Amino acid sequence: MSDQDNTQTSSSKLAPHHNIFMANLESSPTKDRNTSSQNASSSRVIESLHDQIDMLTKTNLQLTTQSQNLLSKLELAQSKESKLLENLNLLKNENENLNSIFERKNKKLKELEKDYSELSNRYNEQKEKMDQLSKLAKKSSAIEQSCSEKLQNMEVNYNSLLESQNLYRDHYSDEISKLNEKIGLLELELSNQNLNYGSDTSSNSDIELNLNKFNDSVKDLKSLETEKDSKLSKIITHSLDELNLQSWLNLYQTNENLISTFAEKMDLKDVLKRNDEKISNKGAVVQTLKKNVQTQVESNNADALSSNNAQDMLPIKMVKLRKTPNTNDSSSNGNSSNNKRRSFYTASPLLSSGSIPKSASPVLPGVKRTASVRKPSSSSSKTNVTHNNDPSTSPTISVPPGVTRTVSSTHKKKRNSMVVHGAQS
């Protein structure tokens, strides 16, 4: 349909030109060639002109044919151009669609890249966690092996302990049964012996009297100690009153001078004022030093008294003695059996004989018999030399043999240190 339309348009365009060309051909002078023979000279010129005209007509026809061909080609080119334009529009639409699709794909690709980066980070984190967990698993496996070995060892030890405990239980149960049998026999023997023993209580009464005497002597010793400590404290206070503190004051003065020189070098005005005030109040400084020494002496005496009282408080208990059996009784089983029973119940053979020997002294059992020796302290020798030898200051009392008077070492050290310090000053 498009080719027919192109041919119609080309024929409609060429029609007026063709009519003009044919009119020119009809009005050409070639028709009057026979009639116009009059002018011979001009005929040649006319013929040449006619030849030229023929040539021009031929060329014109050729040009028309060429123009028709060109028009047909132009129409074909136009049709192709229209087709190409249509194709171009279609391709543009397709290109736009492809661009939109491409943008969508790019967005999706970016999102996928983000997801990939996040997943890669998570993967790395999970990998690190897996490495840590693998290390922990290795450590836990090693610990588990060691614990399993320890558990096995503990099981073996536990089993061995159970076996040994069972063996010990059986052994000691047998021994306990034997001891119960022996105790029953001994109870029967003791019941028989108690029936045969008399009521001799003279030894117990003697021991009670001796204990009462000992308690009275201990009370007297405590009172003497308190009196002596009070006298010593008076002597120490008197010596402190007469004590010369000039060396301490000299040392204090040198320290104050050093502080004042240092303050002058460092431009410390407050320190200089304080030092001037302290130097002006020498009497107050001496009084404070005496008060400090007295408080220290009093505290030392209190500590010594408390330590002496704690050491002197000894527990005294009554010793129960067994009654002596009758040797002439027929129910006794002999001297050897009686001695064994007495040793079993910790009774001494001297006390069980019925009377206390004259050489034995009324002393508690277990107390060592030593001579009461007291070391003279340096403080008493320096302050009052005749104090220990004076009967008025150190009254005597009869102390039972075997009891030693002890003076606490801390009290001696504190008194000695105070008196020596005063002598040095």
From Swiss-Prot:
GO biological process: endoplasmic reticulum inheritance; mRNA transport
Transmembrane segments: none
Membrane topology designation: Peripheral membrane protein
Region feature Disordered, mapped onto this chain: 24-45, 322-425
Residues found modified as Phosphoserine: 343, 394
Cellular location(s): Endoplasmic reticulum membrane
Annotated Gene Ontology cellular component terms: endoplasmic reticulum membrane
Keyword presence, Amino-acid biosynthesis: no
Feature: compositional bias, Polar residues: 35-45, 345-358, 382-397
Database matches in InterPro entries: She3 (IPR031398)
Single annotated GO MF: RNA binding
Sequence similarity: Belongs to the SHE3 family.
Function as written in the Swiss-Prot or TrEMBL entry: RNA-binding protein that binds specific mRNAs including the ASH1 mRNA, coding for a repressor of the HO endonuclease. Part of the mRNA localization machinery that restricts accumulation of certain proteins to the bud and in the daughter cell. Required for the delivery of cortical endoplasmic reticulum into the emerging bud.
Protein name, as recorded: SWI5-dependent HO expression protein 3
Organism of derivation: Saccharomyces cerevisiae (strain AWRI1631) (Baker's yeast)
